[in-house]
Amino acid sequence: MSKVILTGDRPTGPLHVGHYVGSLKRRVELQNSREYDKIFIMIADAQALTDNADNPEKVRQNIIEVALDYLSCGLDPAKSTLFIQSQIPELCELSFYYMNLVTVSRLQRNPTVKSEIQMRNFETSIPVGFFTYPISQAADITAFHACLLYT
């Protein structure tokens, strides 16, 4: 079985030094180490829309900025596959199938979903896309057969 990394960012704003120190520097190291057979780096625009649906233009513009930041930090398209989540329709399709396997009550018990709902004051009106983003993440992971997720 091949060793595959899946990593990426939601384009909700510009990347900053914290992104570089926290993950981008390590991604470049992993890319150059040749320890992994494949590295997929996703710009998760569909997931960014789950809590930015009111401003899709912001997300679209940030896709470009994040891609430029990736390149300027040393991520190399010859060594890593850089892609935009929404441009892979199979990810949406796989998410749809997975949604039939997960109950609403299970999503409601997810600690991350619970805390994010409270943080964003969504208690009375939770957008479905936001509520189901963990399913989308599972589809991303399984579609690429990732053995390491690096944030």
PLM regions with names:
Residues 2-139, 146:
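N-terminal Rossmann-like or analogous alpha/beta NTP/dinucleotide-binding catalytic cores
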Residues 150-151:
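Conserved small/polar residues in nucleotide/adenosyl-binding loops
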